[in-house]
Amino acid sequence: VAEEAKVVAQEMGCIVYSTYDVGVAGIHRLFEPLKEVIEKEVDVVVVVAGREGALASVVAGLVDIPVIAVPTSNSYGFGEKGVSTLMAMLQSCSLGLAVVNIDGGVAAGAVAALIANRAGKFRIRS
């Protein structure tokens, strides 16, 4: 799913930086990638998460960059097939967070690229 988002954004002309395995269960792994996101002045962040889906809310709460959340069908128990992940992401109180459908990597990549390309046009004018 993350690779779908990456490929779509690249095909739409974006430079893509990727980081994997930075879930909230080992939250210490998140800080270095977020530091890089801020230093590189990226225009949008795509967060792909399964299980309880908390990663997107955490990221959106820590950065002032639009975050696109992608729930995955990689789930367990009551929330099987990504339903609880989707619901958790939709209920997030973090501002600047948008959510696409379960396993919606293509949609996330397209929206991220539209945001980044639009921001890039204004950056060039400045």
Segments (PLM) and residue ranges:
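C-terminal binding/interaction regions
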Residues: 35-37, 44, 66, 71-126
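N-terminal small/polar loop signature for handling phosphorylated ligands or for N-terminal nucleophile
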Residues: 22-48, 54, 58-63
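Short glycine/serine/threonine-rich phosphate/pyrophosphate-binding segments
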Residues: 1-4, 27-29, 49-58, 79, ...
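Glycine-rich phosphate/diphosphate-binding loop of Rossmann-like nucleotide-binding domains
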Residues: 1-35
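Alpha-helix C-terminal capping segments
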Residues: 10-12, 58-66, 114-117
